[in-house]
């Protein structure tokens, strides 16, 4: 029987610790970051496939109307809920702040385009994976937006993760 070397043991220990940490993190996700509105604008329990489909369609329409059509007021009027909790540290809470941001961003970059590549929904949570470009020559950014919707299918909370599309990659895969 061949014994594992020190580097192999360290690697096995690291993988084991990471697996235990990920498992513990996943076990605690339901209670880790409760909605700041006390959950009164969210859904609880199970959702029907029709609710999930409605929520996904509403998020796509909300984002497309706001950014591609450059009509953030219309997007908020149709798809915004009574509150808008923002988790991007560079953006303020509230739909007025969202409207102001979209107007400033689309004025600065009139050729801005959001290409939603995929939409994932689970109950009142919807995730979009998008390629955002500011001009046809821009490599752009890969963006994952996470939205929470209320019982009426209106957007009430937002998180995002943004990564620049690099000029070169260590692999032949795209970010999309």
Where are the model-predicted features located?
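Short, low-complexity N-terminal intrinsically disordered segments enriched in polar/charged residues
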Residues: 26-65, 69-78, 172-176
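A short hydrophobic beta-strand element
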Residues: 59, 121-132
